[in-house]
Amino acid sequence: GMLPGYIAETYTKTQTQIDLLNLCKFSNSRLIVDNVIGIDPTEKQVILKDRMPIKFDTLSINTGGEPNLDNIKGAKEFSIPIKPISKLVKVIDDIKRKILQSNEISISVIGGGAGGIELVLALNEYLKTIKSIKKIKINLISRGKYLAQAKNKFSQNCILSFLKDNKINVILKDEVVEIGPNFIKTLKGRIINSEFNFLVTPISPPKW
């Protein structure tokens, strides 16, 4: 939940991360750093790559979700998925370095839910601080009729008005079908120039 704050430079990277070692010490838990390669429900064991299996009575799986990159042509090569967060933080740092060397920037956020709205506003706040950029173009693209469809109509109108006041180009009722190195193509035939394309669409459980 602190990722938008990190992008907007409200928080440092350290503040956005949880120190697992200290957390485990505090909770009298054991921290094991390894890859899980299987689960044996019959024997009630978690199979690890480099260690002996771990027995369990109850197993909680908290690996997070992944975006489906197969539905959009070029998404695997040219999009920036919002999940997993650990990878995104590294990508954000690279993007910020590129932005500091630019005088024009075009960014698109694909997904009109709360996560997409948070992200687009955080990016906008960050870009306002970069004095070297002369031209900023930010797009928010959603296939829905409204932004933040889980919210009530009043909230949706307030969000849309705030985005427009901040000169963010909002595209509704259209769907991204292709992402290229410097462009986005939509189902309705729009070709949008966009250098950095963030994917904040619904996530699925990991394929494993």
PLM segments and residue spans:
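A Rossmann-like FAD-binding core segment of flavoenzymes
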Residues: 31, 38, 127-208
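Short acidic/His/Gly/Ser-rich catalytic and metal-binding motifs that mark active-site loops
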Residues: 1, 68-71, 207-208
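Beta1-alpha1 glycine-rich phosphate/pyrophosphate-binding loop at the start
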Residues: 1-30, 108, 118-150
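FAD-binding core/adjacent interface of flavoenzyme oxidoreductases
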Residues: 26-108, 198
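Rossmann-like dinucleotide/flavin-binding elements
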Residues: 84-139, 190-191, 202-208
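Structural alpha-helical scaffold elements that stabilize or flank donor/cofactor-binding regions
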Residues: 23, 52, 190-191
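Conserved Rossmann-like nucleotide-cofactor binding loop
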Residues: 66, 115, 146
